């Protein structure tokens, strides 16, 4: 693998520079004196911002963008081998790195590289850690998978002491990283188009733990089945958090909710009350996300007052139980949930939010996930009062598994719940306008483009 010398900046070209993660990495390299160019299929606010920062951005992509002065090419997993720039770079014999490989090398510049991993909660917990470090004026560099309002995007270029990064397991991306601290929030079945089964996923997270140096730190949830497995072959420091104070260094008690579902709780350290924490985001799941953030930042020597301030300041990221507005007295929430556990967590948050009936407008994400977690999806969605299903969002897949949203609709109805399947957004919007009433809570849910339904209703 090509090794970047950060003391000798070179010209790096990004294929697909308009992506939220790629654009952030480009900004970090620009701040370190590198010459950066890139291309994408279309212009966007992100590419315009990069141009303003001094980056040469070409639209559309073409072989001619691979010029003789380029020293290294970076590409994402989404780039197909027949992409004209990918082919041209290969033919020119240029060194090439994936996005994950580049991110891993960038981490080596920082004294503390904090990676937040898990099937669920990565974006939120990465944001919580970031908000705490910002509250403590520790000038972190941040790479998060959502829009964090306090930094005006998904990336913040800070000093060289702290790099906070969301670490995704898909295609084993996080195995290219170079962490000094890893947080593992949970390990569940997901991305089964890549992983064989839950054992394969667990093995990947174990390898992720083994990336830590002997003086590194693992922060892990004791609610994960056989959590000791992940660090049995490492000699790094282990700090635990979870629901059981008997086996967790960090836990919570006396959890209470305000009128918007936001939690206040007693922080327990080694079973003893240490402080009272108030969160700025709703949901029981965020209590446990915050415990991980507290464990990480206390290890980084942040005092409790700054920890409490950071957690209170954090009001959420885009598409994580995000209030969009109201129409006809109906409150519209948008959420990225696309896994049964995430759906349950979102509906748990909704239970503490003022509402008459809870509507979920769900767009399943990928055929493989829908097929493999079919019964779990039906069970999770059955906890809503009313369910509307959109077509499956294919993403990177084609329909070869014989599964549809209509099948899921029938399964939900067999559980005694009201559910309809409507195959286009326009008719979904008409149905909701006709059937939602004053005081209802409407949640658009999924990792695709279902958020457009809520936005259209609010126009």
Curated annotation (Swiss-Prot):
GO terms for cellular component: cytoplasm. Signal peptide: none annotated. Pathway: Cell wall biogenesis; peptidoglycan biosynthesis. It comes from the Bacteria. It is found in: Cytoplasm. It catalyses: UDP-N-acetyl-alpha-D-muramate + L-alanine + ATP = UDP-N-acetyl-alpha-D-muramoyl-L-alanine + ADP + phosphate + H(+). ATP binds at residues 118-124. One of its GO terms (biological process) is peptidoglycan biosynthetic process. Coiled coil: none annotated. Its EC number is 6.3.2.8. Its main location: cytoplasm. Keywords: ATP-binding, Cell cycle, Cell division, Cell shape, Cell wall biogenesis/degradation, Cytoplasm, Ligase, Nucleotide-binding, Peptidoglycan synthesis. GO terms for molecular function: ATP binding; UDP-N-acetylmuramate-L-alanine ligase activity. Pfam families: Mur_ligase (PF01225), Mur_ligase_C (PF02875), Mur_ligase_M (PF08245). The keyword Amino-acid biosynthesis does not apply. The keyword Cell wall biogenesis/degradation applies. Cell wall formation. Belongs to the MurCDEF family. This is UDP-N-acetylmuramate--L-alanine ligase. It comes from Lachnospira eligens (strain ATCC 27750 / DSM 3376 / VPI C15-48 / C15-B4) (Eubacterium eligens). The lineage of its organism: Bacteria, Bacillati, Bacillota, Clostridia, Lachnospirales.
């Amino acid at each position: 693998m090509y090794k970047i010398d950060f003391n000798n900046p070179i010209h790096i070209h990004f294929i697909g520079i308009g992506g939220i993660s790629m654009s952030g990495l480009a900004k970090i390299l620009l701040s370190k004196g590198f010459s950066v160019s890139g291309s994408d299929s279309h212009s966007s606010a992100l590419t315009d911002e990069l141009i303003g920062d001094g980056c040469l951005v070409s639209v559309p992509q073409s072989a001619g963008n691979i010029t003789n002065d380029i020293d290294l090419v970076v590409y994402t997993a989404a780039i197909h081998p027949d992409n004209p720039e990918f082919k041209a770079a290969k033919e020119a014999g240029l060194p090439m790195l994936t996005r994950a490989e580049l991110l891993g090398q960038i981490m080596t510049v920082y004294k503390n590289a904090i990676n937040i991993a898990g099937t669920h909660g990565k974006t939120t917990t990465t944001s919580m850690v970031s908000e705490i470090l910002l509250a403590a004026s520790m000038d972190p560099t941040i790479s998060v998978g959502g829009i964090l309002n306090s930094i005006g995007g998904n990336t913040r270029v800070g000093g060289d002491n702290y790099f906070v990064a969301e670490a995704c397991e898909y295609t084993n991306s996080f195995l290219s990283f170079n962490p000094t601290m890893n947080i593992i929030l949970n390990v569940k079945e997901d991305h089964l188009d890549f992983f064989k089964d839950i054992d394969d996923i667990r093995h990947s997270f174990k390898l992720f733990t083994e990336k830590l140096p002997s003086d590194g730190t693992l922060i892990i949830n004791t609610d994960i089945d056989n959590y000791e497995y992940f660090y049995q072959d490492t000699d790094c420091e282990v700090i635990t958090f979870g629901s059981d104070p008997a086996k967790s260094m960090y836990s919570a008690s006396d959890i209470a909710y305000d009128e918007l579902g936001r939690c206040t709780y007693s922080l327990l350290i080694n079973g003893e009350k240490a402080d009272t924490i108030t969160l700025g985001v709703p949901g029981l799941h965020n209590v446990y996300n915050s415990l991980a953030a507290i464990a990480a930042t206390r290890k980084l020597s942040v005092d409790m007052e700054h920890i409490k301030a950071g957690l209170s300041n954090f009001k959420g990221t885009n598409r994580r139980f995000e209030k969009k507005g109201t129409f006809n007295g109906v409150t519209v929430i948008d959420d990225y949930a696309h896994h049964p556990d995430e759906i349950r967590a979102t509906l748990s948050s909704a239970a503490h939010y003022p509402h008459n009936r809870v509507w979920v407008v769900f767009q399943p994400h990928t055929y493989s996930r829908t097929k493999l977690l079919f019964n779990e999806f039906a069970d999770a969605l059955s906890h809503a009062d009313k369910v509307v299903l959109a077509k499956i969002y294919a993403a990177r897949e084609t329909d070869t598994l014989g599964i549809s949203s209509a099948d899921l609709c029938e399964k939900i109805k067999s559980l005694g719940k009201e559910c309809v399947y409507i195959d286009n957004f326009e008719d979904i919007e008409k149905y909701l306008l006709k059937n939602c009433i004053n005081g209802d809570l409407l949640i658009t849910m999924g990792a695709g483009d279902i958020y457009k339904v809520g936005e259209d209703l609010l126009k």
